[in-house]
């Protein structure tokens, strides 16, 4: 009898605690409100304009370098024949090298800006686009850095053997043209990838994978099949997924708490 009384008291306490819980007594949030607050919103990458601007500045610099070198330094690079002596007291080659250095610094700053937005898109769960474009960004900067190294080597050779001055100018202009072509290829591939990504407006990678696995016919039944080639990429992908889920769960908890608090505030107090 005593045990039965304790069980009845325990069930009564549980029932009373449930009735007194304001969260359970609150009205359920509408479905469209949950969709609006909890569904991840797509944020496009705003880096295409920056990349196109960088390529345009690079193109203008190479054109001006060719015009300045051809019009002001041929046939003797040691003589400045520019109208009005615009480059005086500097030589034409010195002006071209200074412009190249300024262009490299500008590219480095814009690379930091692009990397900032790519880190943000990675934190939102878009790891595939991050991994597929990170080498393109680095490659473009490496091409320009390699061009600076070759130009430095040419200047060292010119300082030791100053006789064939026109040959050095031709080499400098050839390096600038080759660097422009290689950078254009990298930036063009990058622009196409980002535009396709922004146009598709996909959901985070983990949600896209859930859609794929929801249809068994789209999954290969081959034993040991892997879509990723190396173990390092698998570990990196799993780590990115775990980090995204942790951030996403924390964000959902904050939004749910805010929605519940606002909904409870709108409810009339019970007497």
Curated annotation (Swiss-Prot):
PTM-bearing positions, type Phosphotyrosine: 213
Stretches in topological domain Cytoplasmic: 1-46, 115-138, 193-271
InterPro entries named among the record's database cross-references: TMEM192
Cell compartments where the protein resides: Lysosome membrane; Late endosome
Alphabetized UniProt keyword annotations: Endosome, Lysosome, Membrane, Phosphoprotein, Transmembrane, Transmembrane helix
One cellular component term from this protein's GO annotations in UniProt: late endosome
Top-level taxon of the source organism: Eukaryota
Phosphothreonine modifications at: 15
UniProt similarity note: Belongs to the TMEM192 family.
Protein name from the UniProt record: Transmembrane protein 192
Organism: Pongo abelii
């Amino acid at each position: 009898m005593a045990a039965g009384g304790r069980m009845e008291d325990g069930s009564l306490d549980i029932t009373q605690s449930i009735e007194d819980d304001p969260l359970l007594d609150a009205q359920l949030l509408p479905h469209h409100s949950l969709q609006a607050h909890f569904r991840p919103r797509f944020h496009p990458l705003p880096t295409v304009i920056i990349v196109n601007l960088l390529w345009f500045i690079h193109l203008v610099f190479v054109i001006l370098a060719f015009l300045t070198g051809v019009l002001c330094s041929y046939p003797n690079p040691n003589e400045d024949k520019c109208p009005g002596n615009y480059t005086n007291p500097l030589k034409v080659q010195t002006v071209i090298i200074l412009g190249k250095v300024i262009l490299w610094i500008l590219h480095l700053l814009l690379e930091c800006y692009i990397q900032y937005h790519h880190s943000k898109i990675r934190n939102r769960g878009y790891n595939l686009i991050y991994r597929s474009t990170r080498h393109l960004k680095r490659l473009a900067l490496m091409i320009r850095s390699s061009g600076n190294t070759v130009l430095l080597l040419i200047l060292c050779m010119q300082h030791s053997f100053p006789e064939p001055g026109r040959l050095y100018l031709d080499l400098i202009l050839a390096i600038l043209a080759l660097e422009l072509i290689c950078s254009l290829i990298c930036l063009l591939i990058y622009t196409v990838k980002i535009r396709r990504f922004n146009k598709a407006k996909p959901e985070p990678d983990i949600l896209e994978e859930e859609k794929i696995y929801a249809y068994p016919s789209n999954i290969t039944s081959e034993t040991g099949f892997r879509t990723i080639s190396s173990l390092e990429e698998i570990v990196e992908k799993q780590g990115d997924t775990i980090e995204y889920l942790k951030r996403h769960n924390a964000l959902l908890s904050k939004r749910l708490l805010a929605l519940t608090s606002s909904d409870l505030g709108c409810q009339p107090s019970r007497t």
